[in-house]
């Protein structure tokens, strides 16, 4: 019988590429059993991601060890942004707890499990694994950078999601009061968050003639029209002399409305100059889409009266324009001009050429010829 396989030598050798990597050289009485087991002992403090959205220190957390060992490898700034999850299974030397044995070549989990007395020296565990999470920013400067999109590189998703959640509402309320025409403020408004609509309602109640208020009215109608109506009412109540307000706040007289219909259909300030819908209340805006008004100009060079009667004829009915406005909130789409295609032009050219060819043939004068008598013998 042959002698039993015995371990004669253990030697720890450093790695070359990474100082955390080491080799445990196992020498047996039979050289064919010699092995070099690669493992790692973590010594870094991480201030960067090992891969997008995650940090994986080279540390195997075995039973009985506190999870604080894992968190000790990341800087405090990252500790707020990442959470520890169940990592992949790993193996560690008990006499060097936390070491991470690499599975490679012949060294596999099955190989370690089959080794006699392996559990006396090798323990199983889970590798430390952190993933990035959404987190609340603690300082106002970071909130300002993320919500104003000055620098979004390290912003959590809840502060960088195109204003879909409430996390930027407080900052944007103050920011947009100072710069309501800012593109980011208009993007916040387009998300139709109620704090945004309320903020712009208050702003436009003082500055309805500003350009961004036209966008404000377009966005809120028809679902949230009360924000716009409130702003228009307050502005026109404070600026009664503003001609733009004459349609919304017309002097209280029912005679015109009684005989001519709703004033949005015939009043000059409603039908001609006030084309911007922000100067109309929403119900007026809807009413104007139903108006059947036609505008025209009549020029009279001479007028003859006979028996106190006069007849005038105008061209109003010849207009081809659409009657009334489009419904509020629906964009006006202009029909594209249809240009002739090259194929159609080529076919037309060929047909014309053929026609001219036959015309030229049949228009030529006849050639005079002599009759030839032929007699068969």
Curated annotation (Swiss-Prot):
What keywords would UniProt list here? ATP-binding, Disulfide bond, DNA-binding, Fusion of virus membrane with host membrane, Helicase, Hydrolase, Late protein, Lipoprotein, Membrane, Myristate, Nucleotide-binding, Phosphoprotein, Signal-anchor, Transcription, Transcription regulation, Transcription termination, Transmembrane, Transmembrane helix, Viral envelope protein, Viral penetration into host cytoplasm, Virion, Virus entry into host cell
Entries under InterPro entries matching the protein: Pox_virus_G9/A16 (IPR004251)
KW Thylakoid (keyword) present: no
Top-level lineage group: Viruses
Q: What is its main location?
A: virion
| Virion surface side of membrane | 2-342
Lipid-modified residues of type N-myristoyl glycine are 2
Q: Which GO terms describe its cellular component?
A: membrane; viral envelope; virion membrane
Post-translational modifications: Most cysteines are linked by disulfide bonds. They are created by the viral disulfide bond formation pathway, a poxvirus-specific redox pathway that operates on the cytoplasmic side of the MV membranes.
Query: A single GO BP annotation from the record?
Result: symbiont entry into host cell
**Segments on the Intravirion face:** 364-377
State the family it belongs to. Answer: Belongs to the orthopoxvirus OPG143 family.
Protein name (database record):
Virion membrane protein OPG143
